[in-house]
């Protein structure tokens, strides 16, 4: 019944009958088709973003976490006035915070665009150039490896076996004379 219309026992109309085994385009049966329709589809482009923990994989723990105490420190005996120290701390912290925000507002989206394009190109090249080249190389090198294997077993194995037998009979006796 290919190419025609098919009505199942419940009156649902199909253009192509759903076979028991199914195929790559249609689910195996009507029950599975309903399950597929009920499942939520998750798209990698629409996943939720965590606005609280913005570094869940801890990429920048040891690099960018710079606080006032990591940069400026006064050893014992050389302390400035407490007010100056507090003002310096506040100035450093607020400047770092707002200047980072300003830079990310100005350059964040263009840099995200640049890095997105870069990693898209990198992924494209890896998928469409690197992996096929490696697979092609592995296929081509199999022929060479078979020829090399025959060469080794034909010429090198007997040669080195003979050399091994020659040197296996060498005995060294060391005696210490007093």
Curated annotation (Swiss-Prot):
Entry keyword S-adenosyl-L-methionine: no
GO terms, biological process: angiogenesis; angiotensin-activated signaling pathway; apoptotic signaling pathway; basement membrane organization; calcium ion transport; canonical Wnt signaling pathway; caveola assembly; caveolin-mediated endocytosis
Purpose: May act as a scaffolding protein within caveolar membranes. Forms a stable heterooligomeric complex with CAV2 that targets to lipid rafts and drives caveolae formation. Mediates the recruitment of CAVIN proteins (CAVIN1/2/3/4) to the caveolae. Interacts directly with G-protein alpha subunits and can functionally regulate their activity. Involved in the costimulatory signal essential for T-cell receptor (TCR)-mediated T-cell activation. Its binding to DPP4 induces T-cell proliferation and NF-kappa-B activation in a T-cell receptor/CD3-dependent manner.
Post-translational modification: Phosphorylated at Tyr-14 by ABL1 in response to oxidative stress.
GO MF terms, alphabetically ordered: ATPase binding; identical protein binding; inward rectifier potassium channel inhibitor activity; nitric-oxide synthase binding; oxysterol binding; peptidase activator activity; protein heterodimerization activity; protein kinase binding
Lineage: Eukaryota, Metazoa, Chordata, Craniata, Vertebrata
Region of interest (Interaction with CAVIN3), residue spans: 82-94
Record PTM Phosphoserine, positions in chain: 2, 9
Subcellular location field: Golgi apparatus membrane; Cell membrane; Membrane, Caveola; Membrane raft
Protein's organism: Otolemur garnettii (Small-eared galago)
Protein name (Swiss-Prot/TrEMBL): Caveolin-1
Lipid-substituted positions (S-palmitoyl cysteine): 133, 143, 156
Residues modified as Phosphotyrosine: 6, 14, 25
Sequence ranges marked intramembrane in UniProt: 105-125
Assembly and binders: Homooligomer. Interacts (via the N-terminus) with DPP4; the interaction is direct. Forms a stable heterooligomeric complex with CAV2 that targets to lipid rafts and drives caveolae formation. Interacts with PACSIN2; this interaction induces membrane tubulation. Interacts with BMX, BTK, CTNNB1, CDH1, GLIPR2, JUP, NOSTRIN, SNAP25 and STX1A. Interacts with SLC7A9. Interacts with TGFBR1. Interacts with CAVIN3 (via leucine-zipper domain) in a cholesterol-sensitive manner. Interacts with CAVIN1. Interacts with EHD2 in a cholesterol-dependent manner.
Organism superkingdom: Eukaryota
Sequence position, cross-link Glycyl lysine isopeptide (Lys-Gly) (interchain with G-Cter in ubiquitin): 5, 26, 30, 39, 47, 57
